[in-house]
Amino acid sequence: MRIAILSQGPELYSTKRLVEAAQLRGHEVHVINPLECYMNINMRQSSIHIGGRELPAFDAVIPRIGASITFYGSAVLRQFEMMGVYALNDSVGISRSRDKLRSMQLMSRRGIGLPITGFANKPSDIPDLIDMVGGAPLVIKLLEGTQGIGVVLAETRKAAESVIEAFMGLKANIMVQEYIKEANGADIRCFVLGDKVIAAMKRQAMPGEFRSNLHRGGTASLVKLTPEERSVAIRAAKTMGLNVAGVDLLRSNHGPVIMEVNSSPGLEGIEGATTKDVAGAIIDFVEKNAIKVKKVTQAQG
């Protein structure tokens, strides 16, 4: 097969591992920077171009689109879809998962365990918003944040009011969530592929830090999932419409709660912690599911 990997970073671990796994299986692989693509959209024959040349036909596309280029990257991916190329994760699923608030609303509708989450627009609503999530300590998150950036733990009510007011004053979109103290600064990353969790790791925050992201100095280790954790991770990925997802959950006193569903999960941490060939499993999944049938994206949710 001819496979396109949409990525701005050909030297990134995840991209290199996917290229390596695909080539080992005899596939032709092209790493394409979505920001270098431009599109011809017409009723006869749509196409994608780079540097004055039309891209050749592809059998499958694996999107590794960074959060900062979600809009343009999704548009390029959608163009591949309109041209009948199989997308490992489609543009609708990616856009849905990148909107943190929308993700929470969709999972709530499906009865998936979540931290109590509040969202408001006016400073006058702040006191009620804080009460809604159980008071301080609480977590304040920028909706556009990634890798733990834009996430604040407010340990007192006064601190919470000040931080929320400041974000509102900057016209930043935030959500407020209950703080799951019993998680002790640890979360679990479940790597979902299709209808299975193929790997999982526990991420522990550094001492004095509550964010467990590996980019923030957290450490990763093997973890044994409960059947409930496995089930809720798969349901969360399905709710987003994703074939591949990194589902982050916390162990709370009332069961697993989903923090985030990542449509472009990194491979380095999960492969390092579990020694599993996750990249190879992804390519095997693409081989089984790529079909040369024109696919039209249908937005749902």
Curated annotation (Swiss-Prot):
Sequence positions that bind ATP: 141, 178-179, 187, 211-213
Keywords tagged on the record: ATP-binding, Ligase, Magnesium, Manganese, Metal-binding, Nucleotide-binding, Protein biosynthesis
Gene Ontology molecular function: any one: ATP binding
Domain ATP-grasp, first and last residues per copy: 104-287
Annotated binding of Mn(2+) 2, by residue: 260, 262
Residues noted as binding Mg(2+) 1 in the record, renumbered to the chain: 248, 260
Enzyme class, first EC level, given as a word: ligase
Binding site for Mg(2+) 2: 260, 262
PANTHER family per the UniProt record, alphabetical: RIBOSOMAL PROTEIN BS6--L-GLUTAMATE LIGASE, RIBOSOMAL PROTEIN S6 MODIFICATION PROTEIN
Family (UniProt): Belongs to the RimK family.
Descriptive protein name: Probable alpha-L-glutamate ligase 2
Organism: Shewanella baltica (strain OS155 / ATCC BAA-1091)
